[in-house]
Amino acid sequence: MSFLDRIAECNAHDPAAYRPLISAGHTIGAVRHRLAQRLRDFPNVFTVSADAVHLLDIFKDADQRSQAVERVVRVLEADGIVRGRRNEAYPVLVNWGDAPLFRIERAAAPHFGIRSYGVHMTGYVRTPDGPQIWVARRAKNKPTYPGMLDNTVAGGQPVGIGLHANMVKECWEEAGIPLELARNAICVGAITYRMDGEDGLKPDVQFCFDLELPADFTPRNTDGEVDEFFLWDWRKTAEVVAETREFKFNCNLVLIDFFIRHGLIDPDRADYLDIVAGLRR
């Protein structure tokens, strides 16, 4: 196995399994054909054809669209199609920085192929032998990817909060990192992928942050979502990423990006440019 295997797993996607979801003239998602057939039961919200699913144009603003889609999501929840409500609203954007076309419950986003955004932070300790990386293990009772390894801090990007403020909030909740340290987190870029998941399409963007931590600081979880933290040499971290599937799928890409930016992957290796290109699809 290799870094390219992890990248390929995050980009396993069959476009033929979906039809586009269109709102206000923009393609903003993709719906599996089976769900598209179910959406025919909501003619006051969607128009469904063999080629696409359209959110009706009678909804004139983000609030109206959000309310209409939420009514459908509630029915899909009752049917057991959408599961694990998070009570967290994700923005539905045409482009990053735009005003949202509407908002959607986080758990429903992949069912509609909505691009989700998140923040992932690699916390590291500088040493003469290269960085040591704080690795989290997700709580065994988490509804998604329980017990898997994770980045030091990570979370979804909901409506109503900026990226850096969200990262600072997540730093405290997930790792007990106080404000005076967390505010030093630097956004260093983003990784993207397009992946077929159990619930639908995940065409997501994760903003990557780095945070150098003092040697005497130990993360501690405060919200029950992390069972433990490990401080690993970067070489061990890279080996686990390349040779196993112990990390949650997108965390692998965040760490590979970290290895590249910190000069830890040899640029003379034959697959170097494929790795670099694969992080942003």
Protein language model regions, located:
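N-terminal leader/linker segments that precede catalytic domains of diphosphate-processing enzymes
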Residues: 1-148, 156-169, 177-220, 224-226, ...
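Catalytic-pocket segment enriched in acidic/His residues
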Residues: 173
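Short aromatic/basic micro-patch
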Residues: 231
